[in-house]
């Protein structure tokens, strides 16, 4: 699996989790990045890195559903988020 394949796979899984938590806005942002990663790696790298800075960033996201924090999903999402950061940085 190439880095781009892995990035696409990670983005798919992150989108699935986000949609389950009714976070369509975030899912759509990640889907847009997935669409560009094969065609414009420079822009994809910039978009991935920009997810991680400032207030309200992807780093600040905590997953809840029906008012209950999703511990397992947050753990999985955190692993995916960290892996995406490192792969994006290497693009």
Identify what each model region corresponds to:
Residues 10, 36, 40, 47, ...:
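Amphipathic coiled-coil alpha-helices
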Residues 53-91:
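Amphipathic alpha-helical binding modules
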Residues 20-62:
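Amphipathic alpha-helical interaction modules
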Residues 1-28, 81-88:
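Short terminal alpha-helical segments
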């Amino acid at each position: 699996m190439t880095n781009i394949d892995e990035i696409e796979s990670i983005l798919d899984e992150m989108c699935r989790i986000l949609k389950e938590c009714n976070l369509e806005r975030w899912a759509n942002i990640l889907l847009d990045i997935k669409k560009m990663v094969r065609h414009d790696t420079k822009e994809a790298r910039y978009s991935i890195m920009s997810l991680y800075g400032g207030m309200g960033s992807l780093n600040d996201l905590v997953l809840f559903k029906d008012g209950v924090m999703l511990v397992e999903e947050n753990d999985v999402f955190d692993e995916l988020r960290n892996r995406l950061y490192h792969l994006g940085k290497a693009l």
